[in-house]
A protein has these predicted regions:
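Alpha-helix termini
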Residues: 13-15, 55, 103, 109
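Mid-length scaffold segments of soluble, non-membrane domains
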Residues: 71-119
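Bacterial Sec-dependent N-terminal signal peptides
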Residues: 1-25
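Residues at beta-strand starts and edge strands
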Residues: 9, 41-43, 96, 107, ...
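Primarily secretory-pathway and cell-envelope proteins
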Residues: 23-68, 119-172
Length: 172
């Protein structure tokens, strides 16, 4: 009888430890978000990311430093997925999942798709794994966006909106 009670006590403690450790990702300071759109040309584009907030910081200085590689989000790597072979930034890209990284500067951002989509941050990033790299201009957005947000139009225009910054590129 003591063995049965001990077993159930250990099981209950283990279960509560596991559920206590399981993190509700929606309650993170930079919560997860996703956007999926099927374009007019039948390409399904999905972006899975976490949304860092500006919180009064200056983009390019206190957050997403100019000239430095950035994971383009927070927490896990940002993932861009396409269901068909496409052209992005004038370059061909095969259907699949890619890690989305950027190098922001004041006037433009370098957009990078890495063949490795399972990285955390930029620590294990290697340029040899790039599937694509191109530069696109940044602009002042029409409205301030506190939490970084991706928007995809039916024409395949991908827009990163964050603070007063807007970075666009097209998936065709």
């Amino acid at each position: 009888m003591k063995q049965i009670i001990s077993f159930f006590a250990i099981a209950a403690i283990s279960f509560s430890a596991m559920t206590g450790c399981a993190q509700d990702k929606s309650k993170r300071p930079s919560p997860p978000a996703s956007v999926t759109v099927t374009t007019q040309k039948g390409v399904t584009i999905s972006i899975h990311y976490s949304q860092p907030s500006v919180k009064g910081r200056t983009i390019g200085k206190e957050i997403a430093a100019f000239g430095e590689m950035w994971r383009t989000g927070a927490n896990e790597a940002t993932i861009l997925e396409v269901n068909k072979d496409v052209t992005i930034g004038g370059k061909k890209v095969k259907a699949g999942k890619y890690g989305l990284y950027t190098i922001p500067t004041e006037k433009d951002w370098t957009v990078i798709l890495s063949k490795k989509s399972n990285l955390w941050g930029t620590d294990n990033y290697s340029q040899t794994d790039d599937a694509l790299r191109f530069v696109t201009p940044s602009a002042k957005s029409k409205a301030f966006t506190e939490k970084m947000t991706f928007v995809i139009s039916p024409a395949g225009k991908v827009s990163l909106l964050w603070g007063d910054v807007q970075v666009d590129f097209t998936v065709e």
